Amino acid sequence: MLKIKRTWKTHSRILDKDPFSIEPPRKVIRALYDYTARKATEVSFAKGDFFHVIGRENDKAWYEVCNPAAGTRGFVPVSHFEEIGKTVKSERDSDGSGQISFTDLTTNSSTTRSSISELHSGSQPLFGIVQFDFAAERPDELEAKAGEAIIIIARSNHEWLVAKPIGRLGGPGLIPLSFIQLRDLKTGAVIKDVSEAVLRISCIPRVEDWKRAAADYKKSSIPLGKFSDGETQTMPSLSPSTENLQINNDVTYQAATDNSSTFPGSVANELTPLQTLESRTASIASKNKKDMSSEPTVVAAMVENYMIRDDQYWYLVRAVMSDGKHRNLCRYYEDFFNFQTKFLELFPNEAGRGDERRVIPYMPGPVDDVNELISSQRAMDLDVYLKEMCRLPARLLENELVKLFFLPLDGDVESPHPTSTMPEALPREPLSFSLPEKAPEKATNISIPESAPTTAGSTCKVKVRLGDETFALRVPSDISFEDFCERLTNKLGECEHLSYRDTNANKVLPLNNVDDLRKACSQESGVLLFAERRRF
């Protein structure tokens, strides 16, 4: 594990090497109240936020904490938190025998308890918390420590499961069911009736089904990009511990995974409708081309979670930029796919197509079907992909393709400090990239998708600054003032004191009616709107 440097420029900006790496937590705590930082070394938080205590755990006044999800580090007041972490309670059965029960916590979810009937309402994947240290005695078993989070991939029988670690790199392996506290992947709810849950939830396949998924995935798990005739590409070698995974000495299957990222059946083809990248690029108006030279480069990035909107899965990307700002971005699988395809074409040597060793990381290729279990694993694979991407040489990260991928689009969030504000998943065309005919490493022609197909001049892009955060939305140019306020309320909540920047007069003017709105939208530079959240 990479060690975090103990210095930082601001209270919430970490780190020079890897802002999302953390030291092993000594405690896990949850906020009881809201708190706004008063010094540069403090961290702001809201009620219900979780932190890892990494220092001064016995101090009566201040904890030194790290939030691995948001990438923040600093000091918080002890009086504002309750300690959760991992506890051990000794209970006595009716026969007097001692029984040890363990409780643990998923640090970035609000844990709720639900009945087994609620779990059966949909095909929801499971993850688990390892309750006891498990020492692998065979190559096909999964070495795991108490408190480690794992995702359940398949079931062998009523005693053994196939699982893969979440918080670290590693392939799948066998682990006893009795060593795991199962939880619902989305809600974090503990599944108390383990046997019924494992047998009845359809998203946990049997080993035979997973074997077929492994074979399908192995066929499709190829590096994205084009290869000329006669070119070959070396695939990552299989992990020795998972290359031949044998269950109960009677079922053996090939796991198409290595120790770095992927897992059988973890990706799906979402490129619908089927179009070429060139046709997508040609359909975007040239007025949307953007000069990326002034854009900051990405310092660190992660895929924190996945969501679903209108039957389409999208991924929450958190990024830290070279200017110190934090971005929460909505990205679809097509965005990753299009980016990787063109990135490999733009840098063929770094893609391993010449004599040099490949340095561009692999990402999961498309397969036929998408479900919640596949999307959860894909989120982890893409998380590894982005973290490996951020370790590339600066000349690659400074390329315009990379800058565009992390550029805030309509609905995305940008803030000078880490924020839990979620981006809005707006309907739009996938990110498209077109390569220049000459000097590919110096410039790229990049097209930014619009939220929806519109005619030129029919929409107005509005940036809204609310405190330290900036939001973006696109509205029809002829929208009424009432409808505009309604859309603003739906996105940001009740706001007041609306104003906008008049670029011609170089001053801030009030936005009170439709005439003010029309004047603001007529500016060539777009609209910068200022708002204050209403205080009740």
From Swiss-Prot:
Task: Tell me which GO cellular component terms the UniProt record holds.
Answer: Cdc42 GTPase complex; cell division site; cell tip; cortical dynamic polarity patch; cytoplasm; cytosol; mating projection tip; nucleus
Ranges where the record places region Disordered: 88-115
Domain (SH3): residue spans on this chain: 24-86, 123-185
Biological process terms in GO annotation = conjugation with cellular fusion; establishment of cell polarity; positive regulation of mating projection assembly; regulation of conjugation with cellular fusion; regulation of establishment or maintenance of cell polarity
Q: Where is the PB1 domain?
A: 459-533
Compositionally biased intervals (Low complexity):
101-115
Which molecular function terms from Gene Ontology are attached?
phosphatidylinositol binding; protein-macromolecule adaptor activity
Can you say what this protein is called? Protein scd2/ral3
Organism listed in the record = Schizosaccharomyces pombe (strain 972 / ATCC 24843) (Fission yeast)
Q: Which gene encodes it?
A: scd2
